[in-house]
Amino acid sequence: MAPKLLKTRLISPYQHDGVKWMSERELAPDYPGGFLCDEMGLGKTVQMIATMLVNPRPKTLIVVPKSIVGQWVSEIKRFAPSLTVYAFNGLDRKMPDSDAPFPSIVVAPYSVLPREPCPLTQVKWDRVILDEGHEIRNPKTKSYIICRSLMADIRWILSGTPVFNSMRDFVTLCAFLGIPRDYTQGYTEDIRKKYVLRRTKVDLAQHNKRLELPKCDFQNVELEMNPHERELYSEVFSYGQDVVRSISKLASVNHRQMELLEALLRVRQVLCYPQLYLDGMAKKEESDPVLWEHGSKKMDTLMELIQSHPKEKALVFCQFTGEMNEIQERLQKLEVPVMRIDGSVTGDNREERISQFKSGKPNSVFLIQIKAGGVGLNLQEATRVYITTPSWNPATELQAIGRAHRTGQLRPVTVRRLVYTGEDSLPSVEMSIMNLQEAKAKICAEILNDPRLESVIPNIPKTKINVQTLKKIFAV
């Protein structure tokens, strides 16, 4: 079902099947729309554009992460030039002139929704699409409340990872579609079969060898802290234990929640790069920063890994901008071409850096802050991916890996995640986070009926650490 107006060829047969299923769901009498949950890199965007051509509607709103507004607009203009598209940035607080023809499609970032007044909420939309729809999984946020309030006949959620932390997330996303919470909780399997379409790269390769992606080799690089790092980590970890131990004795911890979060942040900073911790404490105490002069096992290892493959482009996903600064400085000293995207890089500047990386030298490195560029980027030019520290959710890392390991990739992709190991007397928070990932991956696997998700991030230690609370993380 490739519409004649679509200026590209759909990959047969799965994208044809996807467009057919979506078109039928849009015409369904009960809760038109649903979840398109194809694995990262299988073309959810082009399938959605094709569906809009098959079932044309006057007013479609697409809500996306801020970092990929431009990409959506570009893809629509490229693949469906017959459609009118308008990027709403929220700055002028108004839609196109009322005297002008209303655009077929409005693309807006999630970040504009909570601002008041938001004209998007005043329009009766024919179709609302949430790309990376897991962004609204918390029902208490303004973004979720406003998305729920949007007036629309058809509602879509696009996400390769629609469940992050618990079954509640799935129930919340179903509620956006209009499906009652009680029904979702009682009939999860029925909901999945009727409203969720998910295909994986492995599934497609079994039916068509031409669609088989090259191998993705994922391994943890387990590191031991150098003596100076271990000494600092022990000190900060012990302080965190004291904070958690003290607060856990209180009847209510709400008023001291920030202390708990800061305790976790500080140990993560030490494990990422000790200078981050020293700078953070100096800022908090309004004192002069102390310079860390004792090296970093993680930074040294990352440089060695990058230098050992001088003919392969690499993506390096980071958590903190200070960490990115250190990596960038080290790479520049080694005369390695380096580009970066963090939360401060937007619009044309972002697209320019992507273009520079794509056309750059074979040993180019792209530094990406995982929350700013972990979704929506097509970077098949890279064949090596480095994750400098584990993320809370496995989905975040899967999204990042999917920037390189996706349709159009012709070479094997190597993924290395750097993680500090610990010991019984001094547990590693990074190892605890990986065990938390395992629990969340099981939830995704259950709801999407995809058991492979349980092991999609391999080499998680078999000895389970039930890190449901900071008390468990700090071994209190």
Where do the language-model regions lie?
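SF2 helicase motor core recognition
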Residues: 115-117, 166, 324-328, 366-383, ...
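Catalytic acidic motif of RecA-like/P-loop NTPases
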Residues: 41, 111-114, 134-137, 162, ...
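Conserved Helicase C-terminal RecA-like lobe
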Residues: 47, 54-56, 209-229, 251-366, ...
